[in-house]
Amino acid sequence: SILLALLCIKGCRVIKLCSQKGSSLLTFNYYRAAAHANLPVSSEITGYTASAFAYLHSRTGEHAYLDAAIRTASFLTDTAWDSASHTFPFEPGSDRAYFFDLGIIARGLMAVYRATGDERYLSRARDAALSLGFDFLGDGCFYPVISVPMKEPLPEEPRWSRKPGCYQLKSALIWRQMGDEHADRMFQVALAMALATHETFLSDEPSMETRMDRLH
């Protein structure tokens, strides 16, 4: 069996990733330790895991990791993607989508594409990159979260994930990986925004450790 335990403790929340032997696909979700309850499948965390399995295969050459990467990427491509709204919702069936999540998912798909050469993953990564550019671009910022299927920006909240900021550059890297002129221009826009705002991002958070945690 394959077991990937990636624990990220944030207050009472723990991310618990695992797969059982013989499962037809790999999906991952948040686990709330205090409540002893799994949340629905997280497309973002599944995207991170696709990248992790592809990396493990590149380092070890073990086919089990490649197989896990393929099954994870196939779930993202075939199930998590919402063809009606042409984007990746926060969770399958969710009524919102996050800029940050889309970039992480697309980069995971690109990692598996590089490992396999399967054009399905490249095509879906491009779809996600297009959604980032068309659905989230605002006036001087990229909206952190939009409604699905209407794709209207949702009001900002006093949480890092509900505000635009330099952390979005991590997801915008997918535009560099696309390798075309238009995508590169979008990355340059995101880079300029990050450079212009990084000094004030989370400026109201007194703990440097907490700031770094939020930037992950």
Roles of regions detected by a PLM:
Residues S1-H216:
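Glycan-recognition and catalytic cores of secretory/periplasmic carbohydrate-active enzymes
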